[in-house]
Amino acid sequence: MYVMPSVKRIQKKSPLHGMSCCVITFLVLIVIVWVYGWNVVDDNHTTPQAQHSFIQRRPYDANKCAVSSISDLSDDELRPKAGRRHMVTPPQGGKLALVCCETTKGNMNLLIHQKWAPIGVARFLEMVESNYFETRVPLFRCTDACQFGLAGDPEFTKRFNTRLQDDPMWLPPGIDHRQNERGVKRFPQGYYTYAGGGNDSRNNQFVLTLKPNQFMGGGSPWEVPMGELVGNESFDTIAKIYTGYGEKGPSQGLLRREGNSIKVKTDWPLLDYITSCGVVDETELPE
């Protein structure tokens, strides 16, 4: 906290004394705002964990991915409904963010739906805009689904390690809803959600389904989907991700401590990584 230096009282003040004090006070306020930034919350602006602005974002080359604009997406991708891919109709409308991610096996697009999981979406987009994935995030646990999120730089992992409140689950729970009468499984290929270990346990780790999965989301509110892959390139990319290490990739403890250390690169040389992510387009759809 800035503390003004004390000034001895004098008997006769200069005519400019009052003006000088005002100027000094103004300069101090400018410095405080420059260092700490505005932190104003009112009825229309909520904290990052509650709502993403969908306005300010860092520059990112939209041409890195095959889908560079939301206008390139089909209506089925923008407004998915129950059918051959989705077991149930997801929440409709609201704000959408198109994210492009580069990986060591190619690029992929994620369409993030704020209405699917508003709290989780806000955290993920905050991580994207903080250059989190530019630290080379390892895809360290990949079988039929791929778990990742621990940063290549442990300081980034620590920064986003705080837990989030669960969003409401909109998929049907229980063993009776692992798949429907048409054989559509609860989690189709390319659904994107958080990894967790209990209620309100989401923080900085995610799961992307490489194949349709009937078990996820069955009674785990932290696994509510927040988006899905879109575009043919994305599905071509995840088909190439190395899954040979399975459950025997680097431990979470090792990655938390060391990130992409020499040991990780040496002991798991075939591990794939996400090397960057950025928001390339955004829009809002009516319900």
Language-model features and meaning:
Residues 2-287:
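Cyclophilin-like peptidyl-prolyl cis-trans isomerases
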